[in-house]
Design a protein with these regions (language model features):
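Short glycine- and Lys/Arg-enriched binding-loop motifs that mark or flank ligand-binding interfaces
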Residues: 41-42, 295, 305, 312, ...
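Histidine-centered active-site microenvironments of extracellular/periplasmic hydrolases
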Residues: 298-329
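Metal-dependent active-site segment of extracytoplasmic phospho-/sulfohydrolases and closely related
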Residues: 276, 280-307
Length: 391
């Protein structure tokens, strides 16, 4: 068997050089019978939920946001007076198919305006920044029934996927070159071992994705989420591919020049929405049973700052997309935007716990019981999962 594989794929603790010394970790792969798939997308930096999803019905909104409030006619109406910024217009298609949940006034359970602490809590699933180093996605792999496997579509390993379960990683970055003859010898070495051979072939399949994307000019730059979403879809639809994935995008810390319609944030949200639409299209028939969750570590201040942006806040917005959504809706217990209703008189007040949302998503996507969901999110037994979100 001759293999023309020039690029080096690396996964968590796994490289082709490590294969030669039997350093390959035990990576568990999904079978054709597994239908549940989850992609967790972390927007690092704290994106402005009030800009992304405007509560046009709130009488305080336009006075409060001033220069960062778009005209109502420029927004994409959803329901109950909530509307999307124009950049998120591609999500309207998900909405019309009953595949979109818009989450608002949502926050992690710990009050912080620190990126480091906020991301740590969101990725570990805990209620404080100190504690287990394991990520909640890795714990999910421990409680899921049947075969399962995880992958990070990122330059590094997100904390959400770290833990006792071995997972793979894929990045479009060039990680080195391996001679074809070396790969041929590795194939001969491992073809007699079913487990090692399967992992080796899966690694090469992930490498092929990178080569194909490079040939198409879609290397997955930070400014082009669509390329990474297409890669995620290709990896997850491969026979035996992963069914739990983590992705991340930075650049959401908009302290200055945030803009409104057509501005910096609106354009960045447009690239995200285009990527999500591309992912759905690339999944094909396997979109059925797939769920995508988009969250950020915190929202932004309700009032603009003096440099045309917003500062670190508390509650914000997020999204759940998937075929298993019960029905499209805006999920919130709206707290209001009057001064007395703001958290510490500056931020959108939190009324929705990220863990409650995620428990409901996991139950609907992987048929987890409440007890299993509590194992994914330790010390959260008092947080009721939103089981009604998914079918």
């Amino acid at each position: 068997m001759t293999m023309d594989r020039r690029r080096f794929l690396h996964s968590a603790g796994m490289c082709l050089g490590g294969l030669a010394t039997f350093g390959l970790p035990e990576v568990r792969f999904a079978t054709a019978g597994d239908t549940g798939r989850l992609v967790f997308v972390l927007l690092r930096g704290g994106f402005d939920g009030l800009a992304a999803v405007a509560p046009t019905f709130d009488p305080a909104y336009f006075d409060l946001r001033r220069t960062l409030a778009a005209e109502p006619d420029d927004l994409v109406a959803l329901a109950d007076g909530f509307a999307l910024t124009p950049g998120l217009a591609p999500l309207r298609g998900f909405w019309e198919r009953d595949e979109l949940l818009v989450l608002h006034a949502m926050a992690i359970p710990y009050r912080t305006r620190s990126h480091f602490d906020g991301q740590a809590i969101l990725e570990t699933g805990l209620d404080q920044p100190e504690g287990s180093a394991d990520g909640w996605l890795n714990r999910l792999l421990s409680v899921m029934e049947g075969h399962r496997s995880g992958i990070a579509i990122a330059a590094g390993m997100p904390r959400s996927l770290t833990g006792i379960n071995e997972v793979a990683s894929w990045s479009p970055a060039e990680l080195g070159v391996v001679e074809d003859g070396y790969l041929d010898r590795l194939h001969l070495l491992y073809r007699s071992d079913e487990a090692l051979q399967g992992s080796f072939e899966a690694a090469l399949a992930m490498q092929d994705v990178g080569e194909e994307m490079a040939a198409m000019g879609g290397g997955g730059r930070q400014g082009d989420p669509s390329a990474l979403f297409r890669a995620a879809a290709q990896l997850m639809t491969e026979p035996g591919g992963p069914n739990v994935a983590a992705m991340e995008f930075s650049g959401w810390d908009t302290h200055a020049n945030q803009g409104i319609v057509g501005g910096n944030l609106d354009r960045q949200l447009g690239r995200l929405a285009a990527g999500l639409s591309s992912f759905r299209a690339s999944m094909g028939d396997q979109w059925e049973g797939t769920t995508v969750v988009v969250m950020t570590e915190f929202g932004r201040t309700a009032r603009p700052n003096g440099t045309g942006g917003t500062d670190h806040g508390t509650a914000g917005a997020g999204f759940v997309l998937g075929s298993g959504v019960a029905r499209s809706s805006v999920v919130t217990d709206w707290p209001g935007l009057k001064d007395r209703e703001l958290f510490e008189e500056r931020d959108l007040a939190p009324t929705l716990d990220t863990r409650a949302v995620l428990k409901g998503v996991l139950a609907g996507t992987f048929d987890l019981t409440p007890q299993q969901a509590d194992r994914v999110f330790p010390d959260s037994s008092g947080v009721r999962g939103m089981w009604e979100l998914m079918t």
